Amino acid sequence: MHRGYEKLAEVRSYPQITTLVNRIDWVAGFSNEIPFIAGAERLMEIEVPERAKHIRLILNEMARISSHFVFNGAYALEVGALTPIFYAMEDRERVLDLIESVTGGRFHPNFNRIGGVKPAAGAGPTSKKNIQDLPAGFYRDTKVAMEKVIEAADQFQNLIGGNEVFKKRTKNVGVLTAETAEAYGVSGPILRASGVKSDLRTQTDYLPYDQFDYDIPTGENGDCYDRWDVRVKEMVESAKIVLQAIDSMPSGPLQAKVPKVIKVPKGRTYVSCLLYTSDAADENPS
């Protein structure tokens, strides 16, 4: 399942590679399409329409929420709490339904295209003059779902985060200091749980995150509890981003003009998936 992606990509066209990369992470497949697509677009010097960027951003945050639901529910299960995983899966289904209504896939969206996104799977008939990019009722259903996500995160905090048994089994356990995290190149929620306020969304322009207001949750102790807590709080921030993106959705096309035969020019580019780069790494590149 996770073998030979680079070799497989050598014998496929650029549009076909999208179906490979979203299988790298089955829990948040949509997010894996973004780096490859953005890298190809940079090499081809393609400017993606703003509406397509917003749709990508919304689905990217939904994928993040879906992933965090799995982690938070399974994490509680690992320390002896059986019930939370069922609540997590129920709430996650609501988010997956939205992703499926747009992309046609729950785990493997294959939705991004070099230069934009494809028409929504649940949008009904399309024509060259009028392409339905989002299914009917998507805005309404998304707002309801995101409010439910915020409620679910609050429920997680009350039922699990405040549980004395859970705290005893996670607090001051598996401590990862900020210094050690930086030294080993740790990124994402694990790095932020160690107290480093660093997030790819604020450091690059691969999606228009700079247009929205949100916080970057961090931990204090870098222990097992903080790594759980940061993800719960991130679900709330992701829901806030989605709600803002829905309210500010621009009009316009879904796809930039691209050649019928996609051929990325020879060159080198880098779309960062690393959420933190230390000063030492900058001074001593390897």
Locations of the language-model features?
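Active-site bordering "gate/hinge" segments
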Residues: 1-278
